């Protein structure tokens, strides 16, 4: 089974949390709302977090606070466009982050993004991993 380590920034700005909607044809959770992240081979954890934020959310999003919050694991099944499926062991390293602004420019991994009040998070089609993370945080 392949292993994948994910750095998940839980980004808050003035009581709103950043969610990104995965592109319908990508990732383990296509078309669902999620938190970004991923670690490349040889990369340090915080370097990976900052790179992922830059690549997936743009250069203009300014984080004023980054702190490790928790980690967890599970397994997910990824379905490829040809119908092939793969079980992946996922390790999630979750960070509390505060942004100074909401200036986001998503890349091709996402179809949309939203800054969401805590009480409205339940109204989004969250992927299973994000739902667990937000529940652990007491936001769902």
Curated annotation (Swiss-Prot):
Molecular functions per Gene Ontology: dCTP diphosphatase activity; dTTP diphosphatase activity; dUTP diphosphatase activity; magnesium ion binding
InterPro entries found in the cross-reference section: Nucleoside_triphosphatase_NudI, NUDIX_hydrolase-like_dom_sf, NUDIX_hydrolase_CS, NUDIX_hydrolase_dom
Catalysed reactions listed for this entry: a ribonucleoside 5'-triphosphate + H2O = a ribonucleoside 5'-phosphate + diphosphate + H(+); a 2'-deoxyribonucleoside 5'-triphosphate + H2O = a 2'-deoxyribonucleoside 5'-phosphate + diphosphate + H(+); dUTP + H2O = dUMP + diphosphate + H(+); dTTP + H2O = dTMP + diphosphate + H(+)
Enzyme Commission (EC) number: 3.6.1.9, 3.6.1.12, 3.6.1.-, 3.6.1.23
Residues in coiled coil: none
Keywords: Hydrolase, Magnesium
Xref: SUPFAM superfamilies: Nudix
Domain Nudix hydrolase as annotated: residue spans: 1-140
Transit peptide is among the record's keywords: no
Cofactor (UniProt): Mg(2+)
Self-association state and partner proteins as the record states: Monomer.
Protein function: Catalyzes the hydrolysis of nucleoside triphosphates, with a preference for pyrimidine deoxynucleoside triphosphates (dUTP, dTTP and dCTP).
UniProt protein name: Nucleoside triphosphatase NudI
Chain ranges for the short sequence motif Nudix box as given in the UniProt record: 38-58
Species name: Klebsiella pneumoniae subsp. pneumoniae (strain ATCC 700721 / MGH 78578)
Highest taxon, organism lineage: Bacteria
